[in-house]
Design a protein with these regions (language model features):
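Short, well-ordered beta-strand elements within core beta-sheets of diverse protein domains
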Residues: 112-121, 168-177, 229-233
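A common structural junction motif
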Residues: 100, 189-198, 247-257
Length: 260
């Protein structure tokens, strides 16, 4: 980001962790750089939620959340949140909000209040289950790599522990698959995970990047066809692990037939 600085730069927008491969930014370092150059900083904090990361305490100016994710928590509301100093928020309200006129309905506001009441316990549950899923994937012979901030083999594990109190339910991994057909076999054998690209609700989801393979959007990503993102919901860990095990075993059987 330092090399991207230009004479007319006014804002640094970052996401940490990001929502596919979960690389982190050093928030204190970014904030220090921005203040040195009189730049405003805004971070997308949906991955960690307010429970697991508070970027303002590291010097970031403003925080935005997709409240449709963890804050709502039930996949039934579309909303966003912006947090910052009262003076800044007041200026946004007076100069931007009143111009754009965007506002959530009373019912959506009530749904967010409902979600906030259970947010801490949901995040705790999601993270505990996710840690068990990561541990299972780490020992499976068909798993090539794992992306998760609190995975101890992660190159940024130390930074994650410094900035975050937890890592939530999003992770990704790559499968030792030799073809799209093998990835299709993996997807077709998932019975518990729903194939969907959103996250933050109560149900567990799988998003294999090969779903985009025939679309124009695939050309915009450098992710390999054997890449899968998982969102771990509020279910018990055992059926989720069993589901992944069955799907991976189906791939192994297909690979074995190919070798014969």
């Amino acid at each position: 980001y330092k090399n991207a600085l230009q004479s007319n730069t006014k804002l640094v927008f970052l996401e940490s962790p990001n929502s596919m491969t979960f690389e982190l930014q050093d928030l204190s370092e970014v904030a220090s750089f921005a203040k040195k150059h009189q730049l405003t900083t805004i971070i997308g904090n949906s991955y960690a939620s307010p429970i697991f990361q508070n970027p303002i305490s590291f010097g970031i100016d403003m925080v935005v959340h997709s409240a449709s994710k963890y804050i709502g928590g039930h996949s039934d509301v579309v909303a966003g949140v912006i947090c910052g100093k009262a003076q800044t928020i007041r200026k946004i309200f007076e100069n931007e909000f009143m111009t754009l006129g965007s506002i959530i309905s009373p019912n959506d506001a009530w749904l967010l209040l409902r979600g906030l009441r259970t947010l801490p316990i949901r995040m705790e549950r999601v993270e505990n289950t996710t840690q068990q899923v990561v541990a299972f994937l780490a020992q499976h012979p068909l798993v090539e790599s794992i992306n998760y901030p609190f995975y101890q083999q992660s190159a940024q594990y130390k930074l994650a522990k410094q900035q975050m109190r937890g890592a939530g339910g999003l992770l990704s991994f790559t499968i030792k698959a030799d073809s799209l057909a093998q990835m299709e076999t993996f997807c077709n054998n998932l019975q518990y995970f729903l194939l969907a690209c959103s996250w933050g609700g109560y149900e567990s989801l799988a998003f294999p990047i090969c779903c985009l393979y025939e679309s124009e959007n695939y050309g915009r990503t450098n992710l390999p066809y054997n890449f899968v993102r998982l969102y771990i919901g509020l279910e018990d860990p055992e059926p989720l692990i069993e589901d992944l095990s069955n799907a991976l075993n189906a791939v192994e059987k297909m690979k074995s037939k190919t070798r014969i």
